């Protein structure tokens, strides 16, 4: 019996795959649990339509993410912090502080998406990576200066 998978199943295949299985396995396990539907012409057409819609939405989200990444790449965050004699900061600049500065410039990003190689503890120029989308990352320029 041929079925169209609705879920990723480890030993069978991925979503949308048409696989041949034993009739009992399909009738007693896959179909009742909603893991698959029977591979009829109608179901195959519905699957193709759903795939096209999903691909369209995915492309639209990806384009928005690329636009946001381009906006972030053009920004430079300037932060003034208390620092000691040799430029060592009292405390550290974290991704939470960077997220607040981005929000002030009109870009709202979750702090967990801002990745610093290590906490910023000295005056200088740094680059932070912002994961806008699983496939899109932007480099954010951060300039730390000493407060008077």
From Swiss-Prot:
One of its GO terms (biological process) is translation. PROSITE patterns: RIBOSOMAL_L9. One of its GO terms (cellular component) is ribonucleoprotein complex. GO terms for molecular function: rRNA binding; structural constituent of ribosome. Keywords: Ribonucleoprotein, Ribosomal protein, RNA-binding, rRNA-binding. Coiled coil: none annotated. InterPro entries: Ribosomal_bL9, Ribosomal_bL9/RNase_H1_N, Ribosomal_bL9_bac/chp, Ribosomal_bL9_C, Ribosomal_bL9_C_sf, Ribosomal_bL9_N, Ribosomal_bL9_N_sf. NCBIfam families: L9 (TIGR00158). Belongs to the bacterial ribosomal protein bL9 family. Binds to the 23S rRNA. This is Large ribosomal subunit protein bL9.
């Amino acid at each position: 019996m041929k079925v169209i998978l609705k879920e990723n199943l480890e030993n069978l295949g991925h979503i949308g795959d048409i696989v041949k299985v034993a009739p009992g396995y399909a009738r007693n396990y896959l179909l009742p649990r909603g893991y698959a539907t029977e591979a009829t012409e109608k179901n195959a057409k519905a699957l193709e339509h759903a795939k096209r819609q999903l691909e369209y939405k995915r492309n639209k989200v990806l384009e928005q993410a690329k636009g946001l990444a381009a906006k972030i790449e053009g920004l430079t965050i300037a932060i003034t912090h208390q620092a000691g004699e040799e430029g060592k900061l009292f405390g550290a600049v974290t991704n939470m502080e960077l997220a607040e500065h981005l929000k002030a410039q009109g870009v709202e990003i979750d702090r967990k998406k801002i990745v610093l190689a290590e906490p910023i503890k000295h005056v200088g120029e740094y680059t932070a990576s912002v994961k806008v989308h699983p496939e899109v990352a932007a480099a954010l320029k951060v300039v730390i200066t000493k407060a008077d």
